[in-house]
Amino acid sequence: NAPLRPWQTTRDAIGDLPDPQSKEAAAFDNHIFRAGAKIYPGHSGSVLDEPSKTIKAGAHGVPGGENMLVLDNGDVRYYTVRESARIQTFPDDYHFVASWTESMRQIGNAVPVKLAEAVGSSVYAHLKEIDHAKRRYSNN
């Protein structure tokens, strides 16, 4: 396995997606602009060139602005469902069929896909080792 980077920036995760208000955004499932994001004390959003704040369950991720993005020009907007899913390492072909609010709740409650995969692979490998050891022991 290749060594993992200590972290990934928000831009690394979502930087190749088009602006959700552009015509190109329609080509990406669940990539729809949601208006209303505002900065206020304790609600500041994630910066593109830093790791994303934790995606919290719920539409707005209050408190802390976790489900909000600070753009390069200083403007803020809510993450799209697709952007939130990317941050949680869902594949782009994973389709969320619920409303924006419910989809954001599902993503915020989810274990990141790549983390679940790593844990599952580790558990599987250890169980396999135990099984092999038991078989060797029982054959002696």
Question: Model-derived features: where do they sit?
Answer:
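Flexible, glycine-/basic-rich loop-and-beta segments that form/coincide
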Residues: N1-A27
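C-terminal target-recognition/interaction regions appended to catalytic cores
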Residues: L17-N140
